[in-house]
Amino acid sequence: MSIKEHPPQSEKLQESEPIHVPVLLEITLSKLRPVEGESYLDLTAGYGGHARAFLNRTDNYLNSVLVDRDENAIKTLGDLAEKGVTLIHKDFVSAAQDLVKQGRKFDVILADLGVSSPQLDRAERGFSFRFDGPLDMRMDNRTEITAADIVNSYSVDDLTRLITLYGEENLGRARRIAQAIVKARPIQGTTELADLIKQTVGRGSMKHHPATRTFQALRIEVNRELKLIEELLPLLPRLLNKGGRVGIISFHSLEDRLIKRYFSEQAMAGYEAELIVPEKKPVSGTEDVHNPRSRSAKFRYAVKK
């Protein structure tokens, strides 16, 4: 499951708020090279871990925008809003579309995909089976569909397809899990679902809990994660100034595959390309010695022609 960046402790955070180190922070800073006076767009600002570091370099708060669809995250960024940063409480595609319509362009753009550590660590958000909570998994509580809705309404075939496609689960295991879910419905809790999956397929030789892939699939479906990435990518060149840099941190192969394909298309487009891709291979999260939770992360970046 993907783990996003999080900041050094801010006076705006409650003492009970989980504190985390931003993923690949030094690498993103070195590749995207923010300098004083540049404008910054963070499409997944979270609790401001990357944003604060980038804004410290640019010192251009008035022309910078931070986006997140999680209300809790937006609330913790109030100190940056007081300095002039624009906060947008929307998903990154809706925000990007609005900014394109406004004719806004930026020198540096960052998107750090996936679920954040505070989301995982709050039982009531329902992202993790480490805590017993409702099967929610919504990054934006304003949306209607929850993981419980999917678990308790999808057919065996639809659940099998979902777990196979988005969870990258073996087809046979996915079908057994789907059949067990339908038979056991209604299912409302995270540990209830995780225990059911473990009882159904066992742990075997797997490094991770046998429910990990199913939980990933449900989260992706609830939040339309891959569809939003596909919609975002072609908007990025329209949001960059000439010479502007965009970086994207992904956490699993489904995300990285979409980004790699788009960047490869740009690299092969010749004079029609809108972006230059300096490095074909992504930077791996294993290079981030400061944050062991980032080991599954990959970072790709491009420059506007």
Question: What is the role of each PLM region?
Answer:
Residues 1-305:
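S-adenosyl-L-methionine-dependent methyltransferase catalytic core, i.e., the SAM/SAH-binding region
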